[in-house]
């Protein structure tokens, strides 16, 4: 069930994941691709960065392949973001997984329909099945 609207909507990036960070030896220097920014739930970006597709093989580190969910939430809270409700964060991770699965199907269709012939789109499209498995695992955790 979708959580209630947040008491205080905040600026949400909308695509907060490792592919949209710039970093150097000092750490993250910029966050890119703000076209999906909107006012919303403070936990939405935290759920999106935990979608399994952004771990790039580091499945034991669900927070973008860098750490645990708890480490992410603790850092968020220490930075002034407020307390993270784990159930709310889980809902947004499930939502993000569904969202990514839909995007994978859309990218595959763009390639297969001939509207945009692209190996990149074809390879993203094949990830739809992985996302379906990820979703089943997340839903099992919820049950």
Please name every model-derived segment.
Residues 1-2, 67-71, 128:
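Active-site catalytic-loop/activation-segment of kinase and kinase-like phosphoryl-transfer enzymes
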Residues 15, 33:
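Conserved catalytic-loop position in the HRD/HxD motif
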Residues 43-81, 95-113:
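Active-site activation/catalytic loop segments of kinase-like enzymes and analogous catalytic loops
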Residues 83-95:
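All-alpha amphipathic helical-bundle segments outside canonical DNA-binding/catalytic cores
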Residues 113, 118-143:
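Regulatory N- and C-terminal appendages and interdomain linkers associated
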